[in-house]
Amino acid sequence: MSETIVGLDIGTSTVRAVIGVFTENGELQITGVGKAPSNGLRNGAIINLEAAMSSVTDAIEAAEMMAGHEVLSVYTAIGGSQVSSMNSTGVVGVAGNGKGTQEISQRDIERVLEAAKSVPIDMARQIIHVIPQTYTIDGQKGIKSPLGNVGVRLEAEVHIVTAAVTSIQNLIRCIK
């Protein structure tokens, strides 16, 4: 069975849904699209949950009808004034691979990204994305992919995206 992917754009004026199926050769074939007037939103924020849910349902049902199958999950975005971002840096000692070398492993990369996320944020906000910008190994800057390199100290410069917790929760409730 082909993998189905669904995108949902909840805009202030229109809600749009698109359903695609990956073909055997890896291409994405659009099988359904739907749109509905957007109700219950202002400036990207949900102000009337039931009205917004109805708009989402209408757009998804139109796409499902065209595609001929039911949607089980969607990809969507959150935007507007409830989203903000900041830069951060994380630093860890390289644990190595357990074989006597200090080769940087995937686990080391995960640890340094976790360290970079350890920044104070308002309790009303949640980190939704951490985007690695560049890595530094033992003072050598500008490394895009540290995996497999040898070093003792690993640093990561990241861009952290946060959103208002209530906006995230309302968006999830709107889609469910």
Where are these regions (language model features)?
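Nucleotide/phosphate-binding catalytic cleft detector across ATP-hydrolyzing
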Residues: M1-T14, V18-K176
